[in-house]
Amino acid sequence: MGLFKPKLRSDIQDRIKEIDPRVFVSIPHVNGLPIAENTLCQIYYTDDNLFIDGSGQSFNLSNEKISAIEIKTDVEIQKQYVSSVAGGITGAIVFGPLGALIGGRVKEKKIKNTTRYLIITYTSDNEIKYLGFDITYTPKALEIIKLFNKNNLNKNIIEL
């Protein structure tokens, strides 16, 4: 990640001018659309609609059909066992063969991978459906949630 934004393709620039979104992000698709997983999608959020372009297809979701836009965080912890050659050599020099055994012993190393997903819940044909996108490296996607929540404060009230 650098200080400069990458230059957008001309077709994406034209689409931004056409739609005039409040928020625009490019993020990988995870599930919910009839396109391949990890396909890079352009999402244009306006006050009325959510437009999604990906894999040569365009999708339009009215904000009235959207019931929630949320973030789900998935944490995966991997354990790796590594031995230290340098520790073994240093141990051998300082303490002899016993030092080599202690210095070069196998150690457990934990790697924590955190993945963040943008989950869009909507209703289609009287059925609740979901769209999922990977936003681990796209903090700007949080703006979509803020705008949606700001514009839909009383929407989730259910009349009994």
For each feature predicted by the language model, list its residue ranges.
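Acidic, Ser/Thr- and proline-rich intrinsically disordered linker/docking segments
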Residues: G2-I12, I69-L160
